[in-house]
Amino acid sequence: MPEMGALLLTTPALAAPGELLNLSLNASAVAPEGAVLLAMLATLLVDLAGEKVSTRWVPPICYAGLGTALLLLALQWNAPLEPSFLGAFLPDHLAIAFRAVVALSTLLSLMISWRYAEQGGTPVGEYAGILLAATLGGMLLCGATDLVSVFVSLETLSVASYLLSGYMKRDARSSEAALKYLLVGSAAAAVFLYGSSLLYGLSGSTSLEAIGQALLSSPTPLAALALVFVLATVAFKIAAVPFHQWTPDVYEGSPTPVVAFLSVGSKAAGFALALRLLVGCFGSFDTQWKLLFTVLAVLSMTLGNVVALAQTSMKRMLAYSSIGQAGFVMIGLVCGTEDGFAAMVLYTAAYLFMNLGAFACIILFSIRTGSDRIADYAGLYQKDPLITLGLSLCLLSLGGIPPMLGFFGKIYLFFAGWADHQYVLVVVGLITSVISIYYYIGVIKMMVVKEPQEASDAVKAYPPVQWSTLGLPPLRVALVTCVVVTAVGGILSNPLFQWASDAVAGTPLLQQAIASVNGSSLG
């Protein structure tokens, strides 16, 4: 991205000193993050006024902050591309797309959280404030273009995630999940810092663009070692095998709305980080990191979907499912083509709705029964057809059944992989997709096919459905929204793919990588 460097170099001749600072900072680029920050501060201040005031005002404050952030992101789509904070942040189309996924995942996670938080005795203001802090870190991470801004954003997201996973203080499993997450996450942060120090020593700069140019001109074995450390951190954030060990325990022990956010928002930020670091810094090691990610993708798709077959907990099953889903997204990353990157963006957005829709159903069921055991869903159709329908559609979409949105997302990934001759990834993806359908269909069959006398004890004691109960309307809105987008989104897959393609086309970093791949293939 030489035009960015030229922009900063020519600015002094064009602007006065006071204007120079404004142009270099370009704070308007992070206006969406500013809206989230203001909402976070407001929730914490309102929380000081007491529980009743907090319960009344925190939700609308969060909706206003996140809604404003999404609106500002939409306005940035056609704005001129300018670096922010002295080149440490770049609001390109890739950043806008992933920031929108993070913000929208938080909005939907909060909508499915209120009733769950009230039932568990969780202070709403504190919970929302920490979740917004995680959102702030995730959104900044999507556009960070400097090692310092990457690390600060990464740790903001990580520390808030540790607090959220252990927020149910009365639950021993939640405390255990937080401790495991903290230990593994701290190790990943230390590994990233060491890799960053190697990159700084090799290039003399913390800018990802400058590091990429330095490694391109003089690749060394030490740079390959830095690649291994950075790749390990990225694999931890996206829960790729073999850096996935924390995922099942953390997902099972953490509060369910937190798991919903971690499975989508945190993972989306992780994939944005992967694109920034691997494509931006390690272009000279393109063959090596793609080979490593091919292995990670095969392991993630295989282990995630095979181990999910044996799970008895819905949250644990979706944890292993998310590991497999990360493997599918990695197909687009390994391709390195325009269609591959676009399919990656599209599937991440599709995963947002189908996964959060499934978690909304799980939360509703756990509120009414106190259970997340798969066996307890037996005969649910007799008592709650809405949850049964919503969960069935979301699981079918996760499995890639047509005409759901997830089917078209996988089709675009597999087509991109096949066109790039990634035959192993495509074949493994197809086989593991069939395996995933088996355990998804198993849950649906249990809910629908079981006769009334075969219903589980939890379903037999299922309370009458009362949508007017306090806190349930936002949950119902989130559930219906996710289910409708999941079911109808397949029909609109072409416009969605065009949006994803525009995101790739508006990202100079990816265009350079695509041009490099096309040039090498022609050569």
Curated annotation (Swiss-Prot):
Record's bilayer topology term: Multi-pass membrane protein
Q: Where in the cell is it found?
A: Cellular thylakoid membrane
> Where does the sequence pass through the membrane?
29-49, 57-77, 94-114, 128-148, 182-202, 223-243, 255-275, 291-311, 317-337, 345-365, 389-409, 424-444, 477-497
Highest taxon above the source species: Bacteria
Q: What quaternary structure, including any partners, is listed in this protein's UniProt entry?
A: NDH-1 can be composed of about 15 different subunits; different subcomplexes with different compositions have been identified which probably have different functions.
What is its biological role?
Answer: NDH-1 shuttles electrons from an unknown electron donor, via FMN and iron-sulfur (Fe-S) centers, to quinones in the respiratory and/or the photosynthetic chain. The immediate electron acceptor for the enzyme in this species is believed to be plastoquinone. Couples the redox reaction to proton translocation, and thus conserves the redox energy in a proton gradient. Cyanobacterial NDH-1 also plays a role in inorganic carbon-concentration.
Protein name as catalogued: NAD(P)H-quinone oxidoreductase subunit 2
Which organism's genome codes for this protein?
A: Synechococcus sp. (strain WH7803)
